[in-house]
């Protein structure tokens, strides 16, 4: 997986240097994420709630438009991804809790664009992400009873891949759907008590997002 990341970065660098400055442009801005998850534990579907994450979600894209109707893009992004779950059964005490899981990820996307590059276009692509900060909160009867935080935690699958599709609207507005192909948790993780808290937990995160590309190169992003 690390080889894939390095290859993607090198490919992006070579593609950028291969075009003149006028052929390539950048866009940057923020993303507001509304995430869900398809979750099951011990084979039974679990109840999950909408997770609203307005921060910290930043992204910068490098674009190459081959015509006014087709282009490619790549870039780098930092985002806050996760889900909320009711009825998590803790294998250590067989009690049921409410859980909130999240991860701060840095990602490298690669994709294509079809439509009118100066107005409205549709896009799709693939993204590889590295989860660098994991957080987990446990609630009982509405009160927080535990919190876990870890850098590059083995509780989650640190390397995550996803597919995305969306539409770019005028004035920098953007609507996107993303589905994570990689399970959120590392099922093989074993804690200090010898228990695997996620062994029976299957979780696939997906989200809708609303983002605004605030800048095109160094100027305010507005189509005339």
Q: At which residue positions do the language-model features occur?
A:
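Glycine- and aromatic-enriched membrane insertion/assembly motifs of diderm outer-membrane
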Residues: 47-94
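Bacterial N-terminal signal peptides
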Residues: 6-15
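Residues that define the transmembrane beta-barrel architecture of outer-membrane proteins
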Residues: 22-26, 50-56, 100-106, 157-163, ...
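Boundary at the C-terminal end of the N-terminal hydrophobic targeting segment
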Residues: 18-20, 83
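Short glycine/proline- and aromatic-enriched beta-strand/turn motifs that initiate or cap beta-hairpins
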Residues: 20-63, 211-224
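Flexible, solvent-exposed loop segments that connect beta-strands
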Residues: 40-48, 83-101, 136-155, 187-199, ...
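Residues on the lipid-exposed face of transmembrane beta-strands in outer-membrane beta-barrel proteins
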Residues: 32-34, 54-64, 76-78, 106-116, ...
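Predominantly the C-terminal beta-signal and adjacent terminal strand-loop region
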Residues: 151-224
């Amino acid at each position: 997986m690390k080889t894939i990341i390095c290859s993607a970065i090198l490919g992006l660098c070579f593609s950028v240097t291969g075009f003149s400055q006028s052929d390539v442009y950048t866009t940057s801005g923020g993303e507001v994420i509304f995430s869900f998850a398809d979750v099951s534990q011990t084979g039974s579907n679990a109840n999950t709630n909408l997770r609203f994450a307005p921060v910290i979600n930043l992204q910068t894209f490098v674009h190459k438009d081959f015509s006014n109707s087709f282009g490619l893009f790549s870039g780098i992004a930092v985002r806050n991804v996760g889900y909320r779950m009711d009825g998590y059964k803790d294998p250590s005490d067989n009690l049921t809790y409410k859980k909130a899981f999240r991860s701060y990820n840095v990602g490298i996307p690669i994709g294509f664009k079809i439509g009118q590059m100066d107005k409205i276009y549709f896009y799709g692509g693939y993204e590889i992400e590295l989860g660098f900060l994991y957080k987990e909160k446990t609630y009982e009867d509405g009160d927080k009873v535990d919190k876990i935080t870890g850098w590059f935690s083995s509780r989650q699958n640190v390397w995550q891949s996803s597919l995305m599709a969306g539409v770019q609207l005028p004035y920098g507005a953007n609507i996107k759907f993303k589905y994570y192909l990689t399970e959120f948790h590392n099922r093989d993780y074993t804690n200090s008590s010898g228990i695997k808290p996620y062994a029976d937990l299957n979780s696939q995160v997906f989200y809708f997002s609303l983002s605004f590309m605030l800048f095109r190169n160094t100027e305010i992003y507005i189509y005339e």
